[in-house]
C-alpha cells in the first residue's frame, strides 16, 4: 500500500486498543473477501468486499452518510455509536511500488491501497471519528506478533497443520493446565495473560514457536527460553529435548514454576512436556502420553513428533535411563531380544517345499544359534506350561513319545505342524532351490561336435575271428550299407542274403528277407563300404557265402546255378555288369583282390565312400516283363555308361588279416 499522510498506529498500539477500548475502536479490513475469511483482526469488518460498492466508492457515488452507514452496519465490536470512534485501516504488508498503473480489477493489489486512500480522504472531513489511523506493517506483521488477536470466519478456516486435530491455529478453552507441580501447559493467549500468570506464580516461560511474542511479564532473559520450531512434518524437535530437560530441572531445583506454550497448546508444547515426563518420571512414550492426555485432553501431537518421541525412548533405553520392561514396545529392541523371539519363522505352505528345510545340525547351546535360550525362556510364565507338559506326558501312552521328544526328534517342525524354534536357520542352511531332481550338467568336452565325433571313428576293419565286433560304417545313417566279400576274378553280381540259423538250402524258393545291417564273410580279402543304391560288387561266380545275422551258419551255392543266382535289380537305377569267366575256384582259394567303388556324378564332391551300385532284388517276372521299364542287357555286352562309371576314380580300403 502507499504511504499516507496521516496518523499511523503500531501493532502493539492496535492490540492495546482491542483489549482496552474495543467499544470505541472500529477496525476496517481493506483486503479481499477471501483473505478476510482466512484470517483477520478480531472484531474487524470487511465492508467493501463487493465490487459494486468499490466502484461506487471510486466514482464518488456514495455520500458521507451512506459511507458511515455502511461502516456502522457491518461493525460487530463497536457498540458505542454515539461517541466519537477511533478508526483503524489495514491491508497487506506495506511494499514500495513504482509508477502507478491503472487498476484492472478491484481484487488487484493496488485496489486495497486505493480503498484506504479514498476512505481516509472521505472520512477525515466528517466529525464522526476522533482519528483515522493506518496499521504499520499491515496484517501480516500483526498476525505474527499477536496471533491470539486474529480469527477466521466460520466455514473458511485454514487447512489443519496436523492430522490429529481439525485446526491447530485456534486456541482451545482449556486454559493453563497443571501437569506437574512446577510445569504448566498453555497457549499463546495464556502466556500473554499477566493476571493469570501472577495468580499461578509462573515466572519462567518456554516458547515453542518462531513468531509468538515474548510474554510481557517475563523481565529477565534467564527465565525465558525460545525453541524455534514450526508445527510441520519436517521439523526436528528431539534435539532440543536434553536442553529443555536441563532448563526445567534447573527451575524445579530453584522452586520456580514454568509455563510451556506454543500457538495453540496442542502439538509442540505437549510434545516437550511428554519428553520431560519420560525422563523425569521414567515412563515409556505411551505411558507419558496418557499421563499428559489425562490432564489436558486437547493435546494431539502430529505424527512427526510422535515418531521423535519413540526415537527418544530408544535413546533413554540405551542410556540406561529406562528399563526394557518400561518401553512401550519391548520387541523393538533387538539388542535384548533374539531374532527368534521377535519373529518366529513360518512353515512354508507350498507343497513343493515341505522337505526343503533341513534339520538343525548345530548344537543348541551355540552362541550363533538364534534359538530361544533357557535364560530368556525363563522370563516367560512357566507355571502353566510346565503343568501342561507334565500332564500331557503322563497321559500319553508309552508307545507315543512326549511333545518335547517329538519336538527334539524333528528338526523341521513340531507336533503342531509349526517350524521348530530350536532349528538353526543360518545362511548356510537356507534352502537354495526347490526340492526338484537335479539335472546332471554336461561339460563342454562332452558336447557333440564334428571334431569330437570324428575322433571317435576307427579305420580298422573287423576281424574274421570276431564276428561280433561292431562294423565300421562310413555312410549316411539313413542308408545302412553291408560289407560283402569280393573276388578279383569274378564279374558276376551276387548278393549275400541273411537267413535264419534253422533254415536249410531247400528253402531258396521262398522270398528272402533282407537285412543290410550285418553282412560279413570270412573269405573276403578286402572290405568295401558302399551306398546300397550305388553298390556293385564282384564276387566269384562259382560260389557264394550267405551269412546269417548271427554269423553262425553259411549255405554254399553250386557252381552250375551261377546264371540263376544273378540278382535282378529293382529300384531307380539300371545294373551294368560284365559276364564273369567260368571258374571252379572257391572264394577261400582265390587270391586276395580288391573291389573298386565308382563314384557317381552326383556324389563325386560329397565325400561319401561308395562302391558299385547294389539295389534291391526284384522278382524274375518283373525283370523280364516289358512293363518293368528296362530290358536286361545281353550277356557279354558292355554298356558305355558302365564303362564310364567303372573308369572313374575309386577308393580302396585294403584289410590285411
From Swiss-Prot:
Reactions listed under catalytic activity: O-phospho-L-tyrosyl-[protein] + H2O = L-tyrosyl-[protein] + phosphate
Alphabetized SUPFAM superfamilies for the sequence: (Phosphotyrosine protein) phosphatases II (SSF52799), Rhodanese/Cell cycle control phosphatase (SSF52821)
Pfam family, one: Rhodanese
InterPro entries for the chain: Dual-sp_phosphatase_cat-dom, MKP, Prot-tyrosine_phosphatase-like, Rhodanese-like_dom, Rhodanese-like_dom_sf, Tyr_Pase_AS, Tyr_Pase_dom, TYR_PHOSPHATASE_DUAL_dom
Top EC class for this record: hydrolase
Tyrosine-protein phosphatase domain location: 175-318
Residue ranges constituting the Rhodanese domain according to the UniProt record: 21-151
Tissue expression notes: Expressed in the pharynx, intestine, neurons and vulval hypodermal cells.
Region (Disordered) location: 353-426, 539-563, 581-657
Keywords assigned by UniProt, alphabetized: Hydrolase, Protein phosphatase
Gene Ontology CC annotations of this record: cytoplasm; nucleus
Biased segments, Low complexity type: 366-405, 542-563, 581-597
Database matches in SMART domains: DSPc, RHOD
Annotated Polar residues bias: 406-419
GO molecular function: JUN kinase phosphatase activity; MAP kinase tyrosine phosphatase activity; MAP kinase tyrosine/serine/threonine phosphatase activity; protein tyrosine/threonine phosphatase activity
UniProt family annotation: Belongs to the protein-tyrosine phosphatase family. Non-receptor class dual specificity subfamily.
PANTHER family (UniProt xref): DUAL SPECIFICITY PROTEIN PHOSPHATASE (PTHR10159), TYROSINE-PROTEIN PHOSPHATASE VHP-1 (PTHR10159:SF533)
Purpose of the protein: Acts preferentially on the c-Jun N-terminal kinase (JNK) and p38 MAPKs. Plays an important role in the heavy metal stress response and in axon regeneration by negatively regulating the kgb-1 (JNK-like) and the pmk-1 (p38-type) MAPK signaling pathways.
UniProt-recorded name of the protein: Tyrosine-protein phosphatase vhp-1
Amino acid at each position: 500500500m502507499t504511504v499516507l499522510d496521516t496518523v499511523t498506529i503500531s501493532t502493539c498500539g492496535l492490540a492495546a486498543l482491542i483489549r482496552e477500548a474495543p467499544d470505541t475502536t472500529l477496525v476496517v479490513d481493506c483486503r479481499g473477501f477471501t483473505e478476510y475469511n482466512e484470517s483477520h483482526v478480531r472484531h474487524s469488518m470487511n465492508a467493501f468486499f463487493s465490487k459494486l460498492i468499490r466502484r461506487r466508492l471510486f466514482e464518488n457515488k456514495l455520500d458521507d452518510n451512506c459511507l458511515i452507514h455502511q461502516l456502522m452496519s457491518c461493525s460487530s465490536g463497536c457498540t458505542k455509536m454515539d461517541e466519537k470512534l477511533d478508526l483503524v485501516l489495514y491491508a497487506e504488508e506495506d511494499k514500495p511500488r513504482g509508477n502507478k498503473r491503472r487498476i484492472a480489477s478491484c481484487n488487484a493489489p493496488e485496489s486495497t491501497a486505493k480503498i484506504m486512500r479514498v476512505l481516509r480522504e472521505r472520512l477525515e472531513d466528517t466529525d464522526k471519528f476522533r482519528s483515522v489511523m493506518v496499521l504499520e506493517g499491515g496484517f501480516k506483521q500483526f498476525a505474527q506478533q499477536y496471533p491470539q488477536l486474529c480469527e477466521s470466519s466460520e466455514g473458511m478456516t485454514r487447512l489443519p497443520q496436523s492430522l490429529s486435530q481439525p485446526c491447530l491455529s485456534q486456541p482451545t478453552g482449556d486454559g493453563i493446565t497443571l501437569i506437574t507441580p512446577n510445569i504448566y501447559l498453555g497457549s499463546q493467549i495464556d502466556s500473554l495473560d499477566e493476571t493469570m500468570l501472577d495468580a499461578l506464580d509462573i515466572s519462567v516461560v518456554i516458547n515453542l514457536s518462531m513468531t509468538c511474542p515474548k510474554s510481557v511479564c517475563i523481565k529477565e532473559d534467564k527465565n525465558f527460553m525460545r525453541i524455534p520450531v514450526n508445527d510441520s512434518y519436517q521439523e526436528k524437535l528431539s534435539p532440543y529435548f536434553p536442553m529443555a530437560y536441563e532448563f526445567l530441572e534447573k527451575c524445579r531445583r530453584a522452586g520456580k514454576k514454568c509455563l510451556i506454550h506454543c500457538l495453540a497448546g496442542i502439538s509442540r508444547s505437549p510434545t516437550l512436556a511428554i519428553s520431560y515426563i519420560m525422563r523425569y518420571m521414567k515412563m515409556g512414550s505411551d505411558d507419558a502420553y496418557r499421563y499428559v492426555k489425562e490432564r489436558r485432553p486437547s493435546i494431539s501431537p502430529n505424527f512427526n513428533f510422535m515418531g521423535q518421541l519413540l526415537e527418544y525412548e530408544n535413546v533413554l533405553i540405551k542410556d540406561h535411563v529406562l528399563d526394557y520392561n518400561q518401553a512401550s514396545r519391548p520387541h523393538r529392541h533387538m539388542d535384548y531380544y533374539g531374532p527368534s523371539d521377535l519373529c518366529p519363522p513360518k512353515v512354508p505352505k507350498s507343497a513343493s517345499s515341505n522337505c526343503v528345510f533341513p534339520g538343525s545340525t548345530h548344537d543348541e547351546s551355540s552362541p550363533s544359534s538364534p534359538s530361544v535360550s533357557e535364560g530368556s525362556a525363563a522370563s516367560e510364565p512357566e507355571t502353566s506350561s510346565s503343568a501342561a507338559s507334565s500332564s500331557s506326558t503322563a497321559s500319553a501312552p508309552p508307545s507315543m513319545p512326549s511333545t518335547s521328544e517329538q519336538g527334539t526328534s524333528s528338526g523341521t517342525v513340531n507336533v503342531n505342524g509349526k517350524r521348530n524354534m530350536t532349528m538353526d536357520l543360518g545362511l548356510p542352511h537356507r534352502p537354495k532351490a526347490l526340492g526338484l531332481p537335479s539335472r546332471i550338467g554336461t561339460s563342454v568336452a562332452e558336447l557333440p561336435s564334428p571334431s569330437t565325433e570324428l575322433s571317435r571313428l576307427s579305420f580298422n576293419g573287423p576281424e574274421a575271428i570276431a564276428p561280433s565286433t561292431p562294423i565300421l560304417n562310413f555312410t549316411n545313417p539313413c542308408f545302412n550299407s553291408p560289407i560283402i566279400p569280393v573276388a578279383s576274378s569274378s564279374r558276376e553280381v551276387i548278393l549275400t542274403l541273411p537267413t535264419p540259423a534253422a533254415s536249410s538250402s531247400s528253402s531258396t524258393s521262398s522270398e528272402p528277407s533282407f537285412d543290410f545291417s550285418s553282412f560279413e564273410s570270412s573269405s573276403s580279402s578286402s572290405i568295401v563300404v558302399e551306398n546300397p543304391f550305388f553298390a556293385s560288387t564282384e564276387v566269384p561266380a562259382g560260389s557264394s557265402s550267405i551269412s546269417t545275422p548271427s554269423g553262425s551258419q553259411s549255405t554254399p551255392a553250386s557252381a552250375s546255378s551261377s546264371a540263376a543266382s544273378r540278382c535282378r535289380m529293382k529300384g531307380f537305377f539300371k545294373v551294368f555288369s560284365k559276364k564273369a569267366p567260368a571258374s571252379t575256384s572257391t572264394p577261400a582259394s582265390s587270391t586276395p583282390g580288391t573291389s573298386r567303388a565308382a563314384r557317381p556324378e552326383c556324389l563325386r564332391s560329397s565325400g561319401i565312400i561308395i562302391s558299385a551300385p547294389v539295389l534291391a532284388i526284384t522278382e524274375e517276372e518283373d525283370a523280364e516283363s516289358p512293363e518293368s521299364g528296362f530290358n536286361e542287357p545281353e550277356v557279354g555286352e558292355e554298356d558305355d555308361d558302365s564303362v564310364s562309371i567303372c573308369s572313374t576314380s575309386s577308393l580302396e580300403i585294403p584289410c590285411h588279416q
